[in-house]
Amino acid sequence: MTRLAIPPDIRFGVGGFPLAFTERPEAKDRGAVFAWLRSVGLDAIELQMTYGPRMTAEQGRRYRALAIADDIKLSIHGSYYIVLASPDPAKVLRSVDTLLRTYEQADILGAREIVLHPGSLYGAPEADVSRRFAENLERFMAQLGKTDISLMIETAGKVGQMGSVDMILDVAATIKGVGPCIDFGHVHARSLGGLE
């Protein structure tokens, strides 16, 4: 079998803690995931912060040390409750707070990317909602200031959600510190099986 030479900056990993790990006895200590990933030939993990950044600083520092020891790249998937496109200013403020805390968590972990879904269309045209999202995101990034942590906006898998490839690329091209995260499974679902 011919092995491909993979450039050193390309990593392969998992999102969250896979069943193949969590069903093992050593999974009682979630920190064992880093050695397990290395043992199965993977070198990256996206930590899921579905309900927000709840990890203690001590646990974050421990995960960072374990990830470095096993050469595992860490990234974070931000909470689905971060809704910068919401028409409700109170929800946007809560979202800004959660996203700021996610950046703090990423810094402790040594993660250099935070992945974020742009959210619902709220029954409005994508152009209108994506404009509100981009304006709120631009204000957030200005408030955040200089950072080496990139915010990666991910494509959505449902047509009723904001997150087309074009929208993601437009936002990433216009806001400093923001990049695209193209999830091909989501693109395939969004296009109703359109990827060949």
Predicted feature residues:
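Histidine-acidic metal/acid-base catalytic patches
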Residues: 2-10, 174-184, 188-196
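Short C-terminal domain-edge/linker segments immediately following a structured domain
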Residues: 44-48, 76-79, 104-108, 145-146, ...
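Active-site acidic/histidine proton-transfer and metal-coordination neighborhood
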Residues: 68, 85-180, 189
